[in-house]
């Protein structure tokens, strides 16, 4: 698959999947950014729906719908979707580019070896490293959008959630320090292991269950891509959930935490070890659905794009041939 083709199909598919489950993503973020009442600050200014703690995602979605209507469930969706598109475009672009370059280099290094059987594929560790490299690059581009999106999701009023107001509030609260828009970057960089685990797991599972199609996701059916996406995302989410919770706490409205270690230590001391996996069920639900849809959409988009390129090439060649005949 071409690098640009991979980036475009991956980005479009991820944006479509994000829109499909956005209310769940919104509720999940709010749940993860909640703190226990006993340790709340004296002032509730900027907190998520002051004096309210949601029991679960369903309770959160119902109450948001009652108070804000259907649009309340899509608060901050525009920025989140743009951030998702950009992050995945950059990720898939660099992942495909780095992986192809690495495999080319590896293949050249093995050309001198004789009796090599079967295709050359990266090991699980190599897939993880390649994924981390690509995800780290994407984090640098999209961290500010993630900060704005999380703030939009966790403020109470629709007025405060407006894009320009969020930008102004973050800038003012940090005394003009522009690095505040990269708050949580360290956690984000640590979380690059999440998509790395996801895509490494996807590649390994694809080789195990669909060995004949291991080099092309576009050759799998939408159902096959969906199942592999679900399984691979479940693995990565369970491993990295504490960091996901810490990132939500760092970037939420009214957050007083400055590092993910501080946020995790606070949770452990005040709410116990179990709280480090707070919201893991909605995170898993959202994650596996999005990842499943992403791989399914991406596979179908890849097939559609190839068909369009083929039709365009056929039309161009036919039209060009007719012009040459006419000129003679």
From Swiss-Prot:
What is the protein's membrane topology class? Multi-pass membrane protein
UniProt-listed InterPro entries: Mitochondrial_sb/sol_carrier, Mt_carrier_dom_sf, Peroxisomal_Ade_carrier
One molecular function GO term is: ATP transmembrane transporter activity
Q: Origin, by domain of life?
A: Eukaryota
| Presence of keyword Membrane | yes
Q: Where in or outside the cell?
A: Peroxisome membrane
A biological process from GO = peroxisome organization
Q: Check the record and name the PROSITE patterns matching this protein.
A: SOLCAR
The UniProt family comment states: Belongs to the mitochondrial carrier (TC 2.A.29) family.
| Protein name from the UniProt record | Peroxisomal adenine nucleotide transporter 1
Q: Which organism is it from?
A: Saccharomyces cerevisiae (strain ATCC 204508 / S288c)
What lineage does the source organism belong to? Eukaryota, Fungi, Dikarya, Ascomycota, Saccharomycotina
